[in-house]
């Protein structure tokens, strides 16, 4: 059963000059309008598929949007390569951008993205190297910690620094001993990640931002 856009939806679908902010509640036809807008851009405005960028909060939502776009285009006898489009969660889109522009990053071919367990285990394996920089017990004020808890503690702090885009070199030269320790840990962490061709979940967006800041030709 085909649906026709309302006048308000039609205005959103056909708006192409500058950004448009749409505030709508559940069941108001947001996905329908978005799918129609993308179809309009591809079919009526001849926008290349590689210039289509749709970010969602969940993979389920991204898959649904992709499926509905495919069905809408197929109903018009149009077939496109969805690998060219950027449709997914913020993290999955950033990963695709990094993969497409790997030559401009520190990453090498077949890099690995660590999940939470992998990352904690990474710190567990390299704990001795981090404790040469600074003892976890000194940082938290307790020496009654297992090696795994120490690894988990460093992991949590490194993620916070990555997510907040903290300047590690500046932090490493801070006059406060604990801040200095965090900065030196983070510098060591980045060095080890580069050596082992790894990326963690918290650094995906930061690496993408760094890519765009340092290489305008990337995209």
Language-model-derived ranges and their functions:
Residues 40, 71, 75, 125-129, ...:
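A generic structural signal for well-ordered alpha-helical segments enriched in polar/charged residues
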Residues 56, 77-78, 83-90, 95, ...:
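Conserved ATP-dependent motor core of P-loop NTPases, especially the RecA-like helicase ATPase domain
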Residues 1-107:
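P-loop NTPase Walker
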Residues 63, 67, 71, 124-125, ...:
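Solvent-exposed alpha-helical segments within well-ordered globular domains of core cellular machineries
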């Amino acid at each position: 059963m085909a649906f026709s856009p309302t006048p308000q939806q039609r205005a959103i679908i056909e708006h192409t000059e500058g950004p448009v902010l749409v505030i709508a509640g559940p069941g108001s036809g947001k996905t329908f309008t978005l799918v129609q807008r993308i179809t309009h851009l591809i079919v009526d405005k001849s926008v290349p598929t590689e210039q289509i960028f749709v970010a969602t909060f969940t993979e389920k939502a991204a898959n649904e949007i992709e499926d509905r776009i495919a069905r809408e285009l197929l109903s018009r006898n149009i077939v496109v390569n969805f690998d060219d489009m950027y449709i997914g969660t913020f993290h999955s889109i950033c990963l695709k951008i990094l993969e497409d522009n790997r030559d401009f990053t520190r990453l090498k071919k077949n890099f690995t993205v660590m999940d939470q367990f992998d990352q904690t285990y990474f710190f567990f394996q390299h704990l001795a190297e981090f404790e040469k920089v600074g003892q976890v017990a000194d940082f938290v004020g307790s020496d009654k910690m297992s090696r795994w808890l120490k690894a988990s503690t460093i992991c949590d702090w490194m993620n916070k620094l990555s997510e907040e885009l903290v300047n590690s070199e500046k932090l490493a030269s801070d006059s406060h001993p604990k801040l200095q320790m965090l900065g030196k840990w983070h510098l060591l962490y980045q060095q080890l990640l580069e050596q082992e061709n790894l990326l963690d979940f918290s650094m995906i967006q930061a690496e993408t931002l760094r890519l765009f800041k340092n290489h305008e030709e990337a995209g």
